[in-house]
């Protein structure tokens, strides 16, 4: 009704006995008007592409695609877009973009300490799998650093040792566009609507300014 595109996230590892139910859900959502599906599980991706080639599929960042070989494999499957790993440099993104596949990169949100899609820390510490959409975020908890004698090392009051600052690329938007990024992913899950509106509006303004070749950082900062 609002004229917005709807991308349905299916970015979890799918168990064998869940596959048929997930396929039915995807088909139903497609009939209802979903524009694309963001998928992590390679078995699910292959099955959707084989059964319904008309359905547009995007590769989730949870698939940990981080080089040209991975993107080439995605291209061979016929995916519409690849969401790259958050850890890549602009130079690496630029190299990957030469494969002529639409690329999406994280623009704003939490930056995991571990690599997306291959982190088992939540499973080991909290019995909740990050690859099943249930990350307990143990990397955001306070920790102590011990030396070889098991003595606590002073970190000057810092105890969030595994918790990087949130990801913010608004100052890098022109460089990301030049590198070949076609879409920016902004974290909005479990965020207040006001927060989502503010962040998305700021990035929209920055993207429009970059495409026009003007410096709009002062306006964005306000």
Model-assigned labels for residue ranges:
Residues 1-12, 17-30, 39, 50-51, ...:
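Surface-exposed amphipathic alpha-helical tracts and adjacent flexible/coil segments at the periphery
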Residues 43-44:
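Alpha-helix capping/helix-boundary segments
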Residues 61:
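Residues at the C-termini of beta-strands that transition into short coil/loop
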Residues 64:
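Beta/alpha (TIM)-barrel catalytic core signal, keyed to glycine-rich beta->alpha loops juxtaposed to Asp/Glu
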Residues 68-69:
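Conserved nucleotide-cofactor-binding alpha/beta core module
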């Amino acid at each position: 009704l609002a004229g917005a595109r709807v991308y349905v996230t299916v970015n979890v590892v799918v168990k064998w006995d869940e596959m048929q139910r997930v396929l039915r859900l995807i088909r139903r959502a497609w009939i209802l008007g979903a524009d694309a599906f963001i998928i992590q599980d390679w078995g699910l991706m292959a099955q959707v592409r084989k059964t319904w080639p008309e359905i547009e599929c995007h590769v989730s960042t949870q698939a940990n695609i981080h080089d040209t070989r991975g993107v080439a494999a995605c291209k061979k499957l016929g995916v519409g877009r690849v969401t790259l790993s958050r850890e890549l440099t602009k130079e690496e993104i630029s190299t990957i973009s030469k494969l002529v596949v639409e690329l999406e990169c994280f623009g704003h949100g939490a930056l995991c300490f571990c690599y997306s899609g291959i982190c088992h820390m939540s499973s080991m510490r909290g019995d909740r799998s990050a690859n099943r959409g249930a990350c307990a975020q143990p990397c955001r908890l306070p920790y102590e650093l011990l030396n070889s004698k098991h003595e606590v090392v002073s970190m000057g009051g810092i105890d969030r040792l595994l918790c990087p600052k949130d990801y913010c690329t608004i100052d890098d938007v022109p460089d990301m566009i030049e590198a070949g990024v076609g879409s920016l992913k902004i974290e909005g899950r479990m965020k207040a609507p006001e927060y989502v509106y503010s962040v998305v509006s700021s990035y929209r303004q920055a993207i429009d300014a970059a495409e026009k070749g003007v410096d709009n950082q002062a306006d964005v900062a306000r």
